[in-house]
Amino acid sequence: MLKAVILIGGPQKGTRFRPLSFEVPKPLFPVAGVPMIQHHIEACAQVPGMQEILLIGFYQPDEPLTRFLEAAQQEFNLPIRYLQEFAPLGTGGGLYHFRDQILAGGPEAFFVLNADVCSDFPLSAMLDAHRHRPHPFLLLGTTANRTQSLNYGCIVENPQTHEVLHYVEKPSTFVSDIINCGIYLFSPETLKPLGKFFQRYQQGGQLEDSSVLWPGAGTIRLEQDVFAALAGQGQIYVHLTDGIWSQIKSAGSALYASRLYLSQYQLTHPERLAKHTPGGPRIRGNVYIHPTAKVAPSAVLGPNVSIGEGVTVGEGVRLRESIVLHGATLQEHTCVLHSIVGWGSTVGRWARVEGTPNDPNPNDPRAHMDSESLFKDGKLLPAITILGCRVRIPAEVLILNSIVLPHKELSRSFTNQIIL
């Protein structure tokens, strides 16, 4: 018997995802046509012996989250429950707080997945490795180049046994080119060391600032507190993957993750990819079109385009490397490149909405998406263009490398600006 835990965080996280996270919780943002965490749930549901999936976070159980959970339970025929933290408890604190629910039924092991990662989720391979050599902690790792490794948790392993000898979260100097993917397989006994850390922090009064509202509530961070302390003690091991993987921290990384998942659909869900049909729009590359969307036959879509529910795409529209969300309208002959068009937004005819991609170096197989700051030297860096929900773009204007907050009605062109 197996279980899975998906750590979805809370509204105090995901600030780099704004303005998209204003409308829906970040874990429910559509990536390649389905909510971000549905990719996680699909992967977990395919593991033989999976009995229950638990979501742990600090979001209020509002209507979108409740509706998603009900639909997911029906689709995957698995119990899927949301466990709300009383305060933000960190990646390890939530596991310890809900340890009784996780261990109920006596699971052999349980997966722990961070919600803000994109991956092909090699969970069965991790389970095989765990059963071959059972250990308390098994981490999924991948490789990064020397420069980018500093932005992740770095793992020094024993090449023969794959034991984690040393772990450093976001080191200041190069430690290792093996990085933590944020996907784990834990044995039930892992909750004992979490309890020791919890008690130690309680006794020492070492509480995170986020827990001050609840005196006595301990925050435990798996990466900084647990992995760093237990590395080299024969408890933590790493399973390396060369499959797809990326963090989803910013809106730009969501667009890149959508591209990765759309490419995966060729193997996993070919039925989700649009096909070129007589009288239909021209499809180039991997494109997802929701069944309720209305797309004019003269539109040209792709590659790497995701069109959401109820979207209207007019005659002569050109769409490339973009996400168009629920209820948006692209009027005749608009051009949308490297952009995200928000819920219910309208782009006027002959308008152009364009961004600048910040993709990994295609010549470096170990390169990953950078989650850089929006600004450098007081100037907005060129990035993808984001239209918040219910934005109105007039006809014949250019919106380039800009972020438009929700409910704005523009009257002219903008370049390299945040429109509040």
From Swiss-Prot:
Gene3D superfamilies, per this entry?
A: Hexapeptide repeat proteins, Spore Coat Polysaccharide Biosynthesis Protein SpsA, Chain A
Cellular component annotations (GO), alphabetically ordered: cytoplasm; GDP-mannose pyrophosphorylase complex
Gene Ontology molecular-function annotations:
transferase activity
**Pfam families referenced in this protein's UniProt entry, alphabetically:** GMPPB_C (PF25087), NTP_transferase (PF00483)
For the region Substrate-binding domain, what residue ranges are annotated?
A: 2-251
Q: Does the keyword Lipid metabolism apply?
A: no
Which stretches of sequence are listed as region C-loop?
A: 356-384
Is the keyword Cytoplasm in the record?
A: yes
* InterPro entries in alphabetical order: GMPPB_C, Hexapep_transf_CS, Mannose-1P_guanyltransferase, NTP_transferase_dom, Nucleotide-diphossugar_trans
Q: Which UniProt keywords apply?
A: Cytoplasm
Tissue specificity here reads: Expressed in the liver (at protein level).
Q: What is its main location?
A: cytoplasm
**PROSITE patterns named in the record:** HEXAPEP_TRANSFERASES
GO BP term (any one): biosynthetic process
Binding-site list for GDP-alpha-D-mannose: E85, Q247
Where are the annotated segments for Hexapeptide repeat domain?
Answer: 273-420
Supply the SUPFAM superfamilies for this chain.
Nucleotide-diphospho-sugar transferases (SSF53448)
Q: Where in the cell is it found?
A: Cytoplasm
Q: What is known of its domains?
A: The N-terminal substrate-binding domain adopts a Rossman-like fold and has a binding pocket for GTP or GDP-alpha-D-mannose.
Outline the subunit composition. Component of the GMPPA-GMPPB mannose-1-phosphate guanylyltransferase complex composed of 4 GMPPA subunits and 8 GMPPB subunits; the complex is organized into three layers, a central layer made up of 2 GMPPA dimers sandwiched between two layers each made up of 2 GMPPB dimers.
**Similarity comment: family membership:** Belongs to the transferase hexapeptide repeat family.
Q: In UniProt terms, what function does this protein have?
A: Regulatory subunit of the GMPPA-GMPPB mannose-1-phosphate guanylyltransferase complex; reduces the catalytic activity of GMPPB when part of the complex. Mediates allosteric feedback inhibition of GMPPB catalytic activity upon binding GDP-alpha-D-mannose. Together with GMPPB regulates GDP-alpha-D-mannose levels.
What is the protein name stated in its UniProt record? Mannose-1-phosphate guanylyltransferase regulatory subunit alpha
| Organism whose genome encodes this protein | Sus scrofa
